[in-house]
Amino acid sequence: SCMAQKLKALENEVRNTFGSNCTIQTGAAGTSLALTIPYARTGLELKKEARMHGMSLLILEENAATITILLSCSSITTDDFAPACQLLSRLLNK
């Protein structure tokens, strides 16, 4: 399906951007993925910064060392996968 290809493209982009220090889980519906990545600050800060760049983030889980973010194929167009991942990477590594 078109959505499956889109999800694969998103997953590849996330892997290219974040490398081996991230965990990716595909959502049950096959339209989204959960990205777990080391992050020391609060999810609220991340959401605020992302919003300033026009990106709305859905945070699934937060603990002391990592954060899990939901990335949805339906809310990001394929052309935007790379810029979205780059932006996220910049925000996470601030």
Protein language model regions, located:
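Conserved dinucleotide-binding and phosphotransfer motif residues
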Residues: 53
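A short, small/polar-residue-rich loop/turn motif at beta-strand boundaries
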Residues: 43-48
